[in-house]
């Protein structure tokens, strides 16, 4: 089960940082050692400081600060607790934060390999360029 915790964390982090964003992630309560080991690995790697920030703690205590913090622009919730999902969505509505609920994922499946997961934290903007004939 340890590899699934690490695989799940990497599968959640990779689309966010691939899109050029920073990430604040909450480690799984059951297996926090995977996240702490990954944080130490990222610290010694060439990833700039502050790109990935891993926290340990209780999700019930940290969900509200995640959802209401004004510098957090998107929230991706991995889980199936309907009360926590409702709390995250209502708290995030204060600053029009994008909330994506992913549920429990099977990290070895084809759905976890979808490259469009990058779009969950991206803003698409259109720029018009004038053109003369």
Where are these regions (language model features)?
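Short acidic active-site motifs
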Residues: 61-62
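Short hydrophobic alpha-helical runs that function as membrane-insertion/retention elements
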Residues: 23-26, 53-55, 74-76
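C-terminal segments
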Residues: 70, 76-133
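Residue-level signal for inorganic ion chemistry
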Residues: 20, 52, 66
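Hydrophobic/aromatic ligand-binding patch that stacks against planar heteroaromatic rings
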Residues: 14-17, 65, 91
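Conserved PLP-enzyme active-site core in the AAT-like
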Residues: 32, 65, 85-89
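Conserved small-residue-rich beta-alpha loop and adjacent elements
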Residues: 1-48
């Amino acid at each position: 089960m340890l590899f699934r915790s690490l695989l799940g964390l990497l599968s959640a982090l990779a689309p966010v940082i691939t899109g050029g964003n920073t990430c604040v992630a909450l480690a799984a309560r059951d297996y926090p050692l995977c996240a702490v080991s990954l944080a130490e690995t990222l610290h010694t790697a060439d990833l700039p400081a502050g790109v990935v920030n891993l926290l340990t703690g209780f999700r019930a205590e940290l969900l509200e600060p995640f959802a209401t913090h004004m510098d957090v622009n998107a929230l991706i919730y991995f889980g199936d607790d309907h009360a926590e999902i409702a709390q995250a969505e209502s708290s995030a509505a204060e600053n029009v934060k994008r909330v994506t609920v992913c549920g429990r994922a099977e990290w070895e499946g084809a759905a976890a390999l979808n490259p469009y997961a990058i779009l969950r934290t991206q803003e698409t903007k259109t720029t018009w360029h004038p053109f003369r004939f």
